[in-house]
Amino acid sequence: LLQIARGLEYLHTHKPMIVHRDCKSTNVLINAQGIAKISDFGLARVKRSKYSIIRSLVGTVNWQAVELWSPKPQYNEKVDVWSAAMTFWEALQWHQTEKRYPFQGLNEHQIYMNVRQKHLRYAGIHSNM
């Protein structure tokens, strides 16, 4: 988890800054030495200044930050922090045979409404820990 966070820190402090916009478990590769690397930069965007705002809706719904869900989204690198948190949620379940994910069983509209209105539905990850 720390390696993913440091990878995002590197992207966000790089000049110019890179916003990944699709951080999720399937975009994290682990090599033979157990080192995690962020991959798939197909949706990444370069920010030319710290004041610039990105305005396009991309990414995978279950990992998207709420800033992305407005008709005219305006966001920055913080969307990667939300996505990383969802990825960490998944990683914390490595020992469970049946993994549950935030917003499991909800369609896209229900996920949008739950997150936007802060009616978060947690999948009970803590119950077996």
Model-derived features with residue positions:
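Protein kinase catalytic-loop region centered on the HRD/HxD motif
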Residues: 6-18
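Catalytic-loop of the protein kinase fold
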Residues: 15-30
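Conserved activation segment of eukaryotic-like protein kinases, specifically the C-terminal portion
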Residues: 54-68
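Conserved end of the kinase activation segment
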Residues: 67-78
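C-terminal lobe of the eukaryotic/viral protein kinase catalytic domain
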Residues: 96-129
